[in-house]
Amino acid sequence: ERSPGATLVQRTIMGVPRLFTPTGVVEWGGSAWRVRPTAEQYMPLVEGAVPEAPREVLQGLLDLASHWLSPSRIGATLLHDLVPRPHDDHGQDHSQALPAPPLSVAERAHFAALYSALAQTDLATLVSADGTVTQLGVGLRSSEESEEAVRLDAGMRHRSAARYTWDHHHTVAFVVSEDGPVTLFRRGRNIAVCMAGDCG
């Protein structure tokens, strides 16, 4: 969220109290208060890593991941297709996929609906170049080449997202761990971002 220069007090959907201040977010973690930067403070880092993406889409992805999904411990993989290409669904398993309602990560008014949908679905969510969410529940398959090239000591959600971005260089993945951190992958590499609690 963007800071208006004032301190805002909020109780999340999950009942967690938090304060938005001009310098960060103060959040109750169940046993102690934690301070973390806002998504806006991460924007220079993310824009530098993904300069061709529209700012409003990157900001929306960061806000949704770090201020909605992460505090609620909702694991998610958001695949942002920077340059759509025809017949580019290799590596995708649509057997459990669902068409998305007309929602966009660039529209803050859509976050509550996206939050609800992502809390009830697993696998990857596809986001087009303009921020439109096109599908939910898409499985990711790795090529043999990406399995060789990307050897990541992490959970399945992170490995599959990293390998997918290695196979699809025009796609970046925002991965939200169920324990909070948000990681951005591009070309098979973790290129930024740890946004939960005290992870740094």
Predicted segments with their positions:
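Divalent-cation
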Residues: E1-G200
